[in-house]
Amino acid sequence: ISNYPNPFTSSTVITFKTAGGHTLIQVLDASGRVVANLTDKDYPAGTYTIVFNSGSLPSGMYYARLQNMTIQQVRPMMKARP
């Protein structure tokens, strides 16, 4: 899982690979609270992109978490002030 740009000000594009099957991507804040569910569905194997619009969330560190079958990956993302 990766994202660009990083740091970002209002939105970032998250790219992820899946081996197929159920895929969950969430964004968590520095306290571990889920602030966004970006996708929660079945995907065929492949590489995908999804946009995270941070809206009114404060600047700071966030984490994109990918769960696919038994795989979990976490990507740190920094929201900067505009």
Identify the function of each model-found stretch.
Residues I1-Y4, F8-P82:
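C-terminal outer-membrane/trafficking sorting elements
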